[in-house]
């Protein structure tokens, strides 16, 4: 830092910030000698008690300090990972601190720049240092004035709801609540956060990751994206081979374990249709599952189970429903008294059975909810943030701290999810064997453009899974193998 200017550089990218007003004056792609920023601009904003403030609206520079890069998700390496380095990635990290005397707020801007990788991480934190409570409506993790070379910048955040982006619509390369407003790039939730801070309490913005491409070639760019995920979310390299078991009997579980151990599969997941109940608190039931899972562990097989967290277009039990403005019930709300109890129940199952994996069907997809008496959010506008925070961020953090593998059909990798679908339609499993193989090859080809192979799962239905009869089955394999 020199004369009020902070410079972060690693030979691939360089970002220069004036501490006065926290204004980014340069964001340069050193691989191509291209400048992205058109004009200096405060690189955050925060809305407090209904009013929006940027870095130039009363925030005074207090200090900056070098800090270690953060382990954002608890990480435990497994034998089936192909992780390419340590986590968190080595690099440089700084925190720039500001005070707003009138609001009695301390604001911290955190930048991380990683060695050998053209990626910058940015997050903003707001702390109440006054006596009165304040409400933080929304925080923009990053704001940049960019009109040229937009296609050289890929922006992702942990505030995610997409199943996949497949690399097919990447004209702006800004996804997951990173959006352009004319010439401004803003990384912020689409709706308000609505977090009340008492004295001494702190809230963090969503986390932005910004990758500067080194090439114009489309497929090479996607290779760079995949390389970024391997470094900032190394759990997504866990390329475990798992078997979906559709039975809950002890004998069937032990038989599946024996078969997996014999052929080299590494995990058994009691899947949809198995009858497993991860919400059960019955001690006798949990002890039976524990004994079956212990048998799997003795054979070197990781064990897990399926749970339905969220589903659209059904009428849930009263109290946990997400409500439209017209009062119609469209799905569960994952910020209710019920959802908190649900998460506790599933976590208890994992703790008491020794499960290594959980298959979360219907992870939160950013649906909105009008709220009600049993809801842990205020209204429609803050429902998205609070559901995401409770059902994704906090829960996944707790699961990863236990070393649990998370199989979930949504793009929650930056919060700890290991794998999502590589692309499929369940009805395809009712097609003839030959057609299933053709369809699967199409999905695997397209689905690995924008994600690493280890980030996606697909199925080979040995038995009838979705209809189709004998022509859709691969068992018996000796009879149905292809010449």
Listing of model-derived features with the role each one plays in the protein:
Residues 3-86, 91-95:
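Acidic-aromatic substrate-binding/catalytic surfaces of carbohydrate-active enzymes
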Residues 13, 129, 139-141, 273-275, ...:
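An acidic- and aromatic-residue-enriched active-site/binding cleft used to recognize and process polar
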Residues 55, 59-317, 340:
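Conserved structural scaffold segments of CAZyme catalytic domains across common CAZy folds
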Residues 248-249, 259, 334-361:
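An active-site-proximal structural segment forming one wall of the substrate-binding cleft
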Residues 270-271, 355, 360-362, 408:
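Conserved beta-strand positions
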Residues 284, 288-290, 300-346, 368-380:
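Substrate-binding/active-site clefts of carbohydrate-active enzymes
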Residues 288-301, 383-404:
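Alpha-helix-loop-beta-strand connector modules within alpha/beta enzyme cores
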Residues 312-325, 329, 333-337, 344, ...:
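Glycan-recognition surfaces
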